[in-house]
UniProtKB/Swiss-Prot annotation:
Directly interacts with SKP1 and CUL1. This is F-box only protein 39. Disulfide bonds: none annotated. One of its GO terms (cellular component) is SCF ubiquitin ligase complex. Keywords: Ubl conjugation pathway. The gene is Fbxo39. It comes from Rattus norvegicus (Rat). Substrate-recognition component of the SCF (SKP1-CUL1-F-box protein)-type E3 ubiquitin ligase complex. InterPro entries: F-box-like_dom_sf, F-box_dom, FBXO31/39, LRR_dom_sf.
Length: 443
């Protein structure tokens, strides 16, 4: 239909024209913006359906960080959408993908200023906001552009903070002062905020010892309803744990903590601080994600026995260190959490030492373990040993994912053995496991 045609009500209506509203809304739900606009021209009833609130509650707005004719209208389209349907928004996700230069970051900043201003005036129901991976410490963000964007975001959060239940600013990469300014904006209308989910992983730039900042601890003290908290280990301190114990003991359920090799992580955190938090927040489970922090001495300072650890991920990518050994971590440290560990993820280069036996014993020791994923140098028979233990009821895995590194280009022999193992345990695998095993040349 020509977009210039008037909205008409045909005399001879088809069954489509008499569809119940609930069915029409379902049809519109699956249409893209362009098709929705065209469908709204069919008749008056369809035009009214176009403005149904439930069609516009969830929105992901993606901006390309590369100059392109194809993506030229993204910024204008985003503003048009917010002006037209922003009042219905409840969940908003904004993505700005790898900005190429300062021209595009400036365009994004100006668009965000208009978008957030319009949303702040028309919307009173926004519950979830996610703006991830801005990486504001990159050179493409000039100081003036970065400052203007932070100012717009802070002003918006001051106005909308009383409604927001979920906020994710993962990967913003701010200074401590900038980050705390944004966090304080959430509690501007009152001295506390109602957010239950907060994701500030990589919120601060690398190399910052946030744990020593009184500004950060004061900002976190305004949160009184946290259920899920995601952050970096360079934010963890006795003072933060004390604050969480006092203000969020009745609500806090999950903490996700990332520890990167480039983030300061040598601070002393007392086990008694973790013990108090675990005692008062009795349903708390903590998930750790380590990136290239692999040495036993460092891990032992962080993974204290008082922490109710649910999940541990240890990734070193492809880095190899012949002076490093994973064995003490597997035999002495991780079994400490045998009564709480449910998920284990490993990715490391252990070409210099065999760990099959230690890994197998760790799986058997952790009776609540249901998820096990590993990329490492292993014997193919390691998989068969795990499946045999599963068959005998010695472990209760529901997910088993293994990438077996080899030092050969050809993996024909390993592939043949893995096929034989699968045939032998096919009934067990099909009935109990999310199973993925592969041999992978590591050259």
């Amino acid at each position: 239909m020509d977009e210039d045609s008037e909205v008409t009500q045909p005399q001879d209506q088809s069954c489509w024209a008499t569809l119940p509203d609930v069915c029409l809304r379902r049809v519109f739900w699956w249409l893209g913006d362009r098709d929705r606009s065209r469908a709204a021209l069919v008749c008056r009833k369809w035009n009214q359906i176009m403005y149904s609130a439930d069609l516009w509650r969830y929105r992901t707005i993606t901006f390309s960080g590369r100059p392109s004719r194809v993506h030229a209208s993204e910024f204008e389209s985003a503003l048009w959408y917010v002006k037209k349907f922003g009042r219905y928004l409840e969940h908003l996700e904004i993505k700005f993908l790898n900005p190429y230069n300062a021209v595009l970051t400036k365009k994004f900043q100006v668009t965000m200023r208009g978008l957030l201003s319009c949303l702040g005036k028309s919307n009173n129901r926004l519950r979830s906001l996610s703006i991830q991976h801005l990486e504001l410490d990159r050179l493409v963000w000039r100081n003036s552009i970065r400052g203007s964007l932070i100012k717009s975001l802070s002003f918006f959060l001051k106005k909308m903070g009383k409604h927001l239940d979920h906020l994710s600013l993962k990967g913003a990469r701010l200074t401590v002062e900038q980050g705390c300014h944004i966090l304080n904006s959430l509690s501007y209308m009152r001295n506390e905020n109602v957010a239950s989910e907060l994701n500030i992983e990589d919120f601060f730039s690398h190399h910052l010892a946030v744990y020593g900042s009184s500004q950060f601890n004061k900002a976190m003290a305004t949160f009184h309803n946290l259920t899920f908290l995601t952050l970096n280990y360079n934010c963890i301190s006795d003072e933060l744990l004390e604050t969480l114990s006092e203000n969020n003991a009745g609500t806090l359920r999950t903490m996700n903590i990332k520890c990167h090799v480039h983030d300061p992580h040598g601070q002393v955190v007392w086990g008694m601080s973790w013990a108090k938090l675990a005692r008062q927040a009795s349903n708390l489970k903590v998930n750790f994600f380590f990136e290239r922090v692999m040495k036993y001495e460092r891990l032992a300072r962080i993974l204290l026995q008082e922490i109710p650890v649910r999940s541990i991920s240890l990734r070193s990518c492809y880095f190899s260190d012949p002076d490093w050994s994973m064995r003490p971590t597997l035999t002495d440290l991780l079994p400490t959490f045998r009564n709480t560990l449910q998920k284990l993820t490993f990715e490391f280069n252990n070409n210099h030492e065999s760990l099959d036996e230690q890994l197998h014993l760790l799986i058997l020791a952790c009776r609540k373990l249901f998820y096990f994923k590993i990329w490492a140098f292993l014997d193919v028979k390691f998989v068969e040993r795990i499946l045999k233990s599963q068959e005998e009821g010695q472990c209760s895995l529901r997910t088993l994912k293994v990438r077996i590194y080899t030092n050969r280009y050809e993996t024909n022999e390993e592939d043949r053995t893995l096929r034989e193992i699968y045939r032998k345990y096919r009934k067990l695998i099909d009935s109990e496991l999310n199973y993925f095993v592969i041999a992978y040349p590591m050259m």
